[in-house]
Amino acid sequence: MSASALSSIRFPGSISEYLQVASVLSLLLLLFKTAQLYLHRQWLLSSTQQFPSPPSHWLFGHKILKDQDLQDILTRIKNFPSACPQWLWGSKVRIQVYDPDYMKLILGRSDPKANGSYRFLAPWIGRGLLMLDGQTWFQHRRMLTPAFHYDILKPYTEIMADSVRVMLDKWEQIVGQDSTLEIFRHITLMTLDTIMKCAFSHEGSVQLDRKYKSYIQAVEDLNDLVFSRVRNIFHQNDIIYRVSSNGCKANSACKLAHDHTDQVIKSRRIQLQDEEELEKLKKKRRLDFLDILLFARMENGKSLSDKDLRAEVDTFMFEGHDTTASGISWIFYALATNPEHQQRCRKEIQSLLGDGTSITWNDLDKMPYTTMCIKEALRIYPPVPSVSRELSSPVTFPDGRSLPKGIHVMLSFYGLHHNPTVWPNPEVFDPSRFAPGSSRHSHSFLPFSGGARNCIGKQFAMNELKVAVALTLLRFELLPDPTRVPIPIPRIVLKSKNGIHLHLKKLQ
């Protein structure tokens, strides 16, 4: 066919006509989405009208800097009783709750986790116990509960003590008389060391092996990245987030975290191929966390898939060390800033343990004042600042106000613990609040959440807190650094914007 013949052929429509049609369709789609968002916002405004809040911008919501959330909640508590809406942007709102009666009602229901917040955790920890809902959650919870039976927890006390002593030995070598130490990273390595040995049958010391620092850094990065993504309207879209700089960082951090947990699972599977190891396992009355997962059979008779197995390991690896590290770090800071209570704890521990060469399961219930101080520190600095739920059905609160199905409710444990109508003078460190016989609302103190979905490892965590505090106070006096006062910020766990710096004075 000649060139002249080709040039005479006419195609239906020109490129400009196609562009015009595409522009009209795009405009119609934009108008449709705008109307959809407007109607959704009107529904949200109507649904939350019983709950006053500070003025907000129609598009940008309440203009809150990401590191000022905690200060903002304290202001809201004074002005808006029980609960208050927080608008993140035009059609995104959550009801912040900080009242014990509200907490009791919500935690007593079976509402799922708020998908808008928790789905950003899925690329990291998968759909393990933290993320599951309904019958699947119930099956996994029932399967894992035996890992926290007291027969399992008893021998962990000495393992915890060994890990703490390794950390304290390091501190003796690196602290000077006038120097301060940023303690959070050291404590994080120690709690990872503990969870690896107790729950995952790890041999060796995480604290003395530099390769584990990359996992610690990955967890720290993911804490920040997940929190940042929740607050960014553009990063709600998975495609946009993947190509963003934060999305690339999150992908790299997830890979590091997954490589770590994959290696833990692989190592244990190799160990279990050894007949001697299997014989030792058969003699145990109860299995450890990872062994339960490896030998588990679900109700359909099948073992856990590799995906489900890693999700549970990723979840407990993170929750079992990072939340505990936050708790211990803030407890140490609270004791450093309240020396009279620190000294009273030390005397109690010295009378119980002597020089601390040995600490047993039975000792943990014989330090009442130290336990009171630990609880008071957890009140002021709850390791998990909040959790979120999406209402699966309408709810009416004790004061008569109500919310419809579909609303996101953020249970602010930090707000609850700092609510002056619940805790008079909430900023004052007063361990007597937890004295034996003292009365309080059943849902006024929730460092491990509450209801059926409370922290499955809360007894494990409390034991580790007691061991760490007891052995540390026998070796060091904790003193604050007045030039670097920590600034609490909410991430998945409670962190400090500028670290937690203490003077450590070696005791004679």
Swiss-Prot record:
Its main location: endoplasmic reticulum. Pathway: Lipid metabolism; fatty acid metabolism. It is found in: Endoplasmic reticulum membrane; Microsome membrane. One of its GO terms (cellular component) is endoplasmic reticulum membrane. It comes from the Eukaryota. Keywords: Endoplasmic reticulum, Heme, Iron, Membrane, Metal-binding, Microsome, Monooxygenase, Oxidoreductase, Signal. It catalyses: an organic molecule + reduced [NADPH--hemoprotein reductase] + O2 = an alcohol + oxidized [NADPH--hemoprotein reductase] + H2O + H(+); dodecanoate + reduced [NADPH--hemoprotein reductase] + O2 = 11-hydroxydodecanoate + oxidized [NADPH--hemoprotein reductase] + H2O + H(+); dodecanoate + reduced [NADPH--hemoprotein reductase] + O2 = 12-hydroxydodecanoate + oxidized [NADPH--hemoprotein reductase] + H2O + H(+); (5Z,8Z,11Z,14Z)-eicosatetraenoate + reduced [NADPH--hemoprotein reductase] + O2 = 19-hydroxy-(5Z,8Z,11Z,14Z)-eicosatetraenoate + oxidized [NADPH--hemoprotein reductase] + H2O + H(+). Its EC number is 1.14.14.1. It is a peripheral membrane protein. One of its GO terms (molecular function) is alkane 1-monooxygenase activity. Its cofactor is heme. Gender- and strain-specific expression in kidney (at protein level). Predominantly expressed in males, the expression among strains decreasing in the following order: NMRI > FVB/N > 129 Sv/J > Balb/c > C57BL/6. Expressed in renal arterioles. A cytochrome P450 monooxygenase involved in the metabolism of fatty acids and their oxygenated derivatives (oxylipins). Mechanistically, uses molecular oxygen inserting one oxygen atom into a substrate, and reducing the second into a water molecule, with two electrons provided by NADPH via cytochrome P450 reductase (CPR; NADPH-ferrihemoprotein reductase). Catalyzes predominantly the oxidation of the terminal carbon (omega-oxidation) of saturated and unsaturated fatty acids. May act as a major omega-hydroxylase for dodecanoic (lauric) acid in kidney. This is Cytochrome P450 4A12A.
